[in-house]
Design a protein with these regions (language model features):
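Sec-dependent N-terminal signal peptides
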Residues: 10-20
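N-terminal secretory signal peptides that target proteins for export/translocation
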Residues: 1-11
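Expand to "…catalyze enediolate/carbanion chemistry for C-C bond making/breaking, isomerization
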Residues: 33-329
């Protein structure tokens, strides 16, 4: 009888432990983050949250012929159809407004409208654009960023960044006043491209990861000696989504002319500058971006880069294929 009583006691204890475990699991499920249950609009942020690499393309564009003469010009509709014909790109990138938003905005707006008419949305083709340098004119930078966001973009890249303060100013320009920012209350055509109401857009068009439910992302690029000197202070600014070394510009900084006038790259110094930015990304737990090609994307993934942009065309398409295979996507 004594042994039977002990067996019943063990059974009761086991049942009690299981019951407590089930209650704890239920409580954890009931207190899950609402952001996890809300449908993510911007798939780029979804990939970040999943720890996945991502691969994007420069938007196709009309090119100049020899001597600057215009070749056969494609319409915005044709460019949009060309864009949507390649489905392996996680986002569409454009540097067309780096020199001047005012000059390039009309063509970009027409292109985005053509994308929308062809069926694109933030869910299928999120858009990222370069904005001109911020530090030279802070007031103009705020207007520029607002105008770009109003076209429906979900990411803005700050170029030539050299200080933490200019990053903070740019990040504020991406956020409405209700979220502590300086963006105008005008939303332009952004809700239409996102496929949501204006009211919902105002709620969701905030900066991730500062707002875990936000759908906007910032990219910041360091591409000068001063920027490199301040890269840790820049990377420490909360709100940067992806930090990039400006590989092309940095290549120029670490190149000289030989006796015949040819360019000579200091490969070691150039690579050290790239690794300096990558080290800052790792220290402050920020995704790091790189403009890779099919020959180096595997190496860059191994080093720790996770966001890549490629030029439009066959070489870029091949690079995405190589990158997806190397990253397990």
């Amino acid at each position: 009888m004594f042994e039977a009583a002990k067996a019943r006691q063990r059974s009761q204890i086991s049942f009690g432990v299981i019951s407590v475990a089930l209650l704890v699991a239920s409580a954890c499920a009931d207190t899950s983050d609402p952001a996890d249950m809300q449908e993510r609009l911007n798939p780029m942020i979804g990939l970040h949250e999943q720890g996945q690499s991502q691969f994007g393309m420069y938007a196709p564009a009309n090119r100049r012929g020899r001597g600057g003469a215009a070749g056969e010009q494609k319409t915005p509709t044709q460019l949009a159809q060309e864009t949507l014909g390649f489905t392996e790109s996680d986002y569409i990138f454009s540097g067309s407004m780096e020199g001047s938003v005012e000059r390039a905005l009309p063509a970009w707006t027409s292109y985005v409208e053509a994308l929308k008419e062809a069926g694109a949305t933030i869910r299928t083709n999120p858009l990222v654009v370069k904005t001109p340098g911020i530090a030279e004119d802070l007031e103009l930078a705020t207007r520029n960023i607002g105008a770009q966001l109003n076209t429906g973009v979900s990411g803005v890249m700050f170029v030539g960044v050299e200080s933490a303060d200019e990053v903070r100013h740019g990040l504020a320009a991406m956020r409405f006043a209700a979220n502590g920012g300086s963006r105008s209350e005008d939303v332009g055509n952004a809700p239409a491209y996102w496929g949501i109401s204006e009211a919902e857009y105002r709620t969701r068009a905030d900066l991730w990861p500062l707002n875990p439910e936000g759908e906007l992302i910032n990219w910041t690029i360091v591409e000068s000696l001063e920027g490199l000197a301040n890269v840790r202070e820049i990377a420490a600014v909360e709100g940067i989504g992806v930090l990039w070394p400006g590989a092309g510009t940095l290549r120029g900084l670490f190149s000289t002319r030989d006796a015949s006038g040819g360019r000579v790259l200091d490969e070691e110094a150039w690579e050290a500058s790239i690794q300096q930015v990558l080290d800052a990304c790792k220290e402050f737990d920020i995704a790091c971006g790189f403009p890779a090609n099919e020959n180096d994307i595997g190496m860059r993934i191994e080093q720790g880069f996770s966001v890549f942009v490629m030029n439009w065309g066959d070489a870029g398409f091949r690079t995405i294929d190589v990158g997806r295979q190397a990253s397990g996507r």
